[in-house]
């Protein structure tokens, strides 16, 4: 890290999937989460503080050049929709987070699952950024893991140049890195999930809700250029 690096505040940072991608794009990252992810932060080298998202935004917002937020996705997920009343048990934070980020006055990105109430988001799929793995007995597998990214605060995201390609058999990363009812069973499943996601440092529990660093890198490259453009206008 260098003093000239732009600072990105990563709210709901979890196991550091987004943080790693933004770091690879050139940002210094400050991670905020109510759960303890000091181990992950230490392994990949970003600053971490255990606190609520709004406390982190209040304390570190002025230091940040940009903000990324990944509010809890369970309320909007397909799995929750399968059980009547389950979604309502989870917090609905996309709206409050957006309002707070707009008030912060920094370029921002809100990430969530398909079905979340995001404004004009860009969707990324593992096939768009070449995320694959191999598993004994199953050969080459592709990662789908569709995620939405809403830009705000003046930031615009160009759509991906490639479309989804679900030709390969899919490795599904859910259930805390365990195969569950998936047809992919046996030794090496969790390791294959980590390889497909590009998150070698994560625990099984962190895998479930993480985004691949490649997604955040794709966003981060455009965010970095946006900040350069803003600096050139001053």
Where are these regions (language model features)?
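Class I S-adenosyl-L-methionine
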Residues: 11, 33, 45, 54-66, ...
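Phosphate-coordination loops involved in phosphoryl transfer and adenosine-cofactor binding
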Residues: 3-5
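SAM cofactor-binding core of SAM-dependent methyltransferases
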Residues: 7-57, 68, 76
């Amino acid at each position: 890290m260098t003093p000239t690096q732009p600072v990105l505040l990563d709210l709901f940072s979890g196991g550091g999937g987004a943080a790693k991608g933004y770091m690879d794009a050139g940002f210094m990252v400050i991670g905020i989460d109510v759960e303890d992810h000091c181990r992950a932060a230490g392994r990949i080298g970003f600053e971490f503080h255990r606190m609520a998202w709004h406390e982190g935004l209040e304390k570190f917002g002025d230091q940040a050049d940009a903000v990324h937020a990944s509010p809890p996705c369970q309320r909007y997920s397909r799995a929750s929709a399968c059980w009547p009343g389950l979604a309502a048990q989870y917090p609905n934070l996309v709206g409050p987070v957006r309002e707070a980020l707009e008030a912060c006055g920094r370029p921002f990105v809100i990430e969530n699952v398909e079905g979340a109430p995001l404004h004009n988001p860009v969707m990324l799929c593992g096939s768009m950024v070449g995320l694959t793995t191999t598993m004994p007995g199953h050969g080459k597998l592709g990662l789908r893991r569709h995620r939405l990214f809403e830009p705000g605060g003046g930031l615009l995201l160009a759509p991906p140049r490639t479309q989804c390609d679900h030709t390969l058999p899919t490795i599904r990363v859910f259930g805390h890195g365990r195969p569950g009812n998936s047809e992919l069973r046996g030794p090496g499943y969790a390791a294959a999930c980590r390889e497909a996601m590009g998150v070698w440092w994560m625990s099984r529990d962190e895998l479930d809700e993480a985004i691949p660093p490649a997604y955040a890198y794709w966003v981060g490259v455009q965010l970095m250029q946006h900040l350069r453009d803003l600096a050139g206008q001053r």
